[in-house]
Amino acid sequence: MQCPHCHRETVVKNGTRRLQDEQVVQYYRCRDCHRNFNERTGTPMARLRTPSRVVELALKNRSEGMGARATGRVFDQSHTTILQWEARLAEHADAWSPPAPAGREVTLEGDEVYTRVGENLPAADSEGWTLTFFERESRYWVTALAGQKDEELFKQGTETTWNWAQGADFIRWFTDGERRYGQALWPLASEYLPERGLAISYPYRKVWREGLEVAMKIKGSQGKPRVEWVKVDHPFTAISPSSEVHANHNEAHNAALRRRCSAYRRRQNLYAKAKTALQRTLDVQ
């Protein structure tokens, strides 16, 4: 074990302490910096006086669709305490994100979901848009960013998702009819082909990275869906059948999100009051 303060391994045990829920916490002392800490230091449970079982059940109820004030009434806590527990957990969300599996194929589905934030503004001016990316095979929720539906939101969401997936050898990037996904991904994942060793019949020089396929499914205003590949694919990248280009799993996940997260529930006064609060509820889902 390393010391969380000086990051050295000269650590010895320094007694135990029994908490209110009868849980025993081990304490340690560093011989170099002479500072004491316990096994909870640096975790969401650090310096928490409430029994861990109560915190676990409260956050589980929040992730199953119960509002913050209702959760506080059930567990005899203030709603601000519930929100502080969520903020603690959201701060450590990045540490629990596994990287994309190297040497395997990754299929990403991108979509947006809308909810009200603060005042009841038009959808174009609201900060309640949430950009989500979903890995098809593992059902892993890669990215969830809340904000106004503009180029900055698509840029941040695309960059976060690409940083997670770029380690995989084969990436399939499927979205809905929104073209700003491809526009944000093009500067990150495009490359120039060498002039030598390329067939004359292939007229393009700037293409997607080898192994990356970017396509979107357009539903169409007349009920005639079609599939469109974005930009130019690498000549050595395999193309998927049109039937596999969709974001159905992500759309189903967004529908389930409206049941599991109270801030996304329609026709109920449970919306988030600010964008930061909406992002916090997304991080703990």
Regions found by a protein language model. Give the residues of each.
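Residue-level recognition of single "structural anchor" positions
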Residues: 1-285
